[in-house]
Amino acid sequence: MTASASRPLLGCIADDFTGATDLANMLVKSGMRTVQTIGVPAESASIDADAIVVALKSRTIPAADAVAQSLAAYEWLRAQGCRQFFFKYCSTFDSTDAGNIGPVADALLDAAGGGFTIACPAFPENGRTIYRGHLFVGDVLLNESGMENHPLTPMKDANLVRVLQRQTSSKVGLIRYDTIARGAADVRACIAQLRADGVRIAIADALSDRDLYVLGEACAALPLVTGGSGIALGLPENFRRAAELAARDNAASLPRIDGTATVLAGSASKATNAQVAAWRATRPSFRIDPLAAARGEPVVDQALAFARSHLPEPVLIYATATPDEVKAVQQALGVEAAGELVERTLAAIAHGLRALGVRKFVVAGGETSGAVVQALGVKSLQIGAQIDPGVPATATIDTEPLGLALKSGNFGAVDFFDKALRALDGAA
């Protein structure tokens, strides 16, 4: 295959929508023209891109369903001609003892072959590092970072070898930081020894971007790689080294999109709470009350009326709340029902906003982003320049043009909403 061929080289499967854009952002920064599809396309298509990211909504669904969706995505990507496959999950390893990281990794490894893969959610640029198999968020262990209070995937153990081993019958091992520090050749030797010992999946330490580049080089021959978006840093260079990927300076170009903008927030993370507070201090905002929505009050109509009264000025419509407030709603409605209600409400609001002429959406929260893009009928996205680490601007390429910034809950600076609006306006 030559560098000018249009068939994609890297096929990626992400377990949520913002995670998919996070990964696509990383690939674009590394010079790969990247297209993100929303779900598995219904039919084969000729996509002119170096990498394709299939965005699923499989992180918290039953494990068997997550496996089925992931395998369907794999088969579709394989049919497009992808040479290597990547299973992307959150940099905080969001999962439970039932999955879904372990079951999906096992199924994809069986399908792709090779008998071995790594698991590395590290993203040092965003403070996620792995040392001796333990995941840190900033300076604290994962289970002390606030993730222990996550409503759907509470992370109460920072030892990823233990966490993953509880999810899989495959033997889980570790590639230590000191091996990685010695370079790709030593990592490949470690992989060979782990395979000889019966290990199928190895957690990989990573303290810096250099470690991720080393791991990427060491994984060049693996049919399947798994991890957070950070590990994708080193994968494009493998294709360049093999003269399969051309050098590009326009991988992040997007069309300009006119129209008004709105911010929608559903995440209850610390970062999103801070971003909501910063916006509310100076800008118009409307709070969604899940309990009012559950009582049948016209919350969607009220939110749309609020937005209409302020257009063309951007407004924030949010369900973001403190952990105690979230817990109270969950106790009243049930954990799953509460989350689904918030997603359904914000999705309906997004649909209504589009009818009002809104063409640019900033969305905070992985589950919320998934619900919103589905409500807007988005099928695929072209990935543009980074707004904040892990979050790019995007534009739809298969519907009436829309600009989207889809943010994982914990990502972004305090002023992210303003920065995202400027980026979607073409000013950033």
From Swiss-Prot:
EC annotation from Swiss-Prot or TrEMBL: 2.7.1.217
Annotated residues that bind ATP are located at S267, G365, G366, E367, T368, G409
- Catalytic activity entry: 3-dehydro-L-erythronate + ATP = 3-dehydro-4-O-phospho-L-erythronate + ADP + H(+); 3-dehydro-D-erythronate + ATP = 3-dehydro-4-O-phospho-D-erythronate + ADP + H(+)
Q: Which InterPro entries match?
A: 4-carb_acid_sugar_kinase_N, 4-carb_acid_sugar_kinase_N_sf, NBD_C, NBD_C_sf, OtnK
**Entry GO MF terms:** ATP binding; kinase activity
Q: Which SUPFAM superfamilies match?
A: YgbK-like
Query: Any idea which UniProt keywords this protein has?
Result: ATP-binding, Carbohydrate metabolism, Kinase, Nucleotide-binding, Transferase
Q: What EC class does the entry list? A: transferase
Known role: Catalyzes the ATP-dependent phosphorylation of 3-oxo-tetronate to 3-oxo-tetronate 4-phosphate.
Q: Which family does it belong to?
A: Belongs to the four-carbon acid sugar kinase family.
* Protein's recorded name: 3-oxo-tetronate kinase
* Name of the gene this protein is made from: otnK
